[in-house]
Amino acid sequence: MTSQELKKLLNDIDHKSYPAYKALRGSYDFDRYILNIEHVQGDPFAAPSQLSISLPVTTAGYPDFSMANTSALTALCDFLLRSFNAEVTRYSFQAKGSGKSGLIQVAQPGLEIFERSDCEIVKEKLIIRFFVGFPANGRTINSRELEKIFFEFLPKCVEKSLLYRNLCADTLKKWIYLAEDQAAIRTQLAALSLCAFIADGSILPRESGISQKPMKSAVAFTSPASLRVSLDLPHAGKISGMGVSKGITLIVGGGYHGKSTLLNSLELGIYNHIPGDGREYVITDDTAIKLLAEDGRFIKDVDISLFINDLPNKKDTHSFSTEDASGSTSQAAGVIEGMEAGSRLFLIDEDTSATNFMVRDAFMQRVISSDKEPITPFTARARELYENAGISTILVAGSSGAFFHIADTIIQMDNYHTVDITSHVKDLLCEYPVPADSAKPFALPASKRIMTKDPQGTPKRRDYRTGAVKNNDNDSLKVKVLTRDSFMIGKQTVDLRYVEQLTDSEQTASLAILLKYAVEHLIDGKKTVAMIVDELNRIYKRDGMSAFMDGRPLSGGYTMPRTQEIAACLNRYRRA
C-alpha cells in the first residue's frame, strides 16, 4: 500500500475506539523506505506498537567499505542505531495523548557493540525496528497525532540518521576501522599464544559503580617492558601493549591499586567497545568466563569430582545435584560447566571466590588430614586444567601466597601501574617449598547433564466442566524480563546475577526466548546442555533470531548471547 492510502486509513479511523488501530497493520511505501506496522497495541496504556523501516542500502548510499565484512557490517548497524536513537529521542512524546501516546523508542546501546535485532542489514536492505505509542485521548483514537509521527517525524529521522549523505563520514569510518582492528587483534591472539591483550594508553577505571564511562584523569595503562608485544593492525598500524600469555597469570597488589579493575576490563574484553570507551584495544579470548561462588545456586547432574569427593552425606559428586549449593560446590560446578561450554580461559577474583575452594595452605593440611577434607582446591588443579584441557587462568589474589607456586606470570598492580614481578617472586619461592599435593589423579569430567522436560514446566489449564488441571499443549510458556540479570519463564525466576559478563538487557531478553524455545522444542531427555546450545546456535546462524519468535514478527530488543551465557542460563533452569 502507498503512504497516501495509510493517510486515508488514519482519517477513516479518527475518533473511533482504540482497537480500530488494528486496521493499520501492513506495509506502506514512503518512496525511499517501507514502513511496516507489525503489531498494534491493545490500548494506549499497553506496551507500544511494534514497527520497522526497511530501506535499500543503494538508496541509503552506504560505501562499500562499510559492508566489506561481518565486523564492518556490525559496526555500521551499531552506528546507524545510535544515530537513529538520537533523532527519534528528540521527537518522542511530541505527539500528545494518554498513556504511552507519542512514544517513539528504539534501543539505546551501551559501550559494547553487538549484533542486534534492532538494526540489521538483510538481503541488501537496512531494517530498523522500533516502538511507537499510538496516540489516543482516553481510549479514543487521535490519528491526527499519529499522522504527525508517520508523515513528519519519522521521515525527518530517516533522512538525518540513516542516509549516508547526512551522516558524519569521518565518525562512521572511525567506527568501521576500529571494528576491523579489533577483529585483527582477536585473530592475532591465537597466533601469539596469548589469551588477552591490553593496549598501552588504555583507560581501564570506570567513572563510578553505576557508570561504565571512562574515569576522567585516570592513569593510562602502561605495559611492563618484559610483557610488551607489538601488533600490526590494518588501520591503526603498529600498537603496543601487554600480552597475557596462555597458562596461569596471577595479578597481585595492595588493596585499591587496580587489581580488580584490570580483571573487570579483561572480563568485558570478550566484546568490542566503541571509540572513546578507553578499552577499545582491551581484547580477551572470546570464550573467557568469570568464575565466582554462588551460594544458594541450583545445580543438577554436574560431575564435580575433579574438586569434591567423599562428602559426609555420601552424595555422589560424579553427578552432583542440589537446590542450595554452597560457595565451594557452586564454584566447582561453574568450572565444569565452563569446560563443557568450551571456555579456554577462566577469570577469577579471590574476593568473590569460596576460600576453601581456591586454596588449602600447608598448616591447614597438617591440622586437617587429606582423608578428612573432601575438597581438592583450585590451586591443585589449575596447572592440570591448562596442560590437560588447554584452559588458562587469570587470577586476582591479595591474601594467600599459595597462588604464587602455580603461576607462570605474576603481575603486580601498584597504584594502577603494572609491574612484572615474576622473576623476583620465583627467586623468593626457593625459600618456600611447594606444599604437599594430596590431590587425586586428574580426570576430565565424564558425565554431562541431560536436560529432561519437567511436567511442571508445561503450561496448565483447568477443565471448566470437571475442574481438573491438565497440560495444555496448545499454550506456550510465558516469559517476562524482570531486570538485566533475571527473567521469568512460566512461574519460575531464572537468576543470572552471577553471570557477570551479561551487560545488556537485550542479552537477557534473548536468553529468555532461547530457553523458552529449548523447553518447548529441544529438551527431550536425550540431549545434553552442550547439544542444546549447539542446536540453538545452529538455528540462529541459519535463520536468525526470528526463528525463536513462534511465528510472531521479530521486534527490536534482542541480541544473541555467547555460547557460554546460553549454557549458564540452561544450567540455572530448575525445571529440566
Feature-to-residue mapping (PLM):
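Carboxylate/His-rich catalytic cores and anion/metal-binding grooves
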Residues: A190-A196, D200, Y256, L263-E294, ...
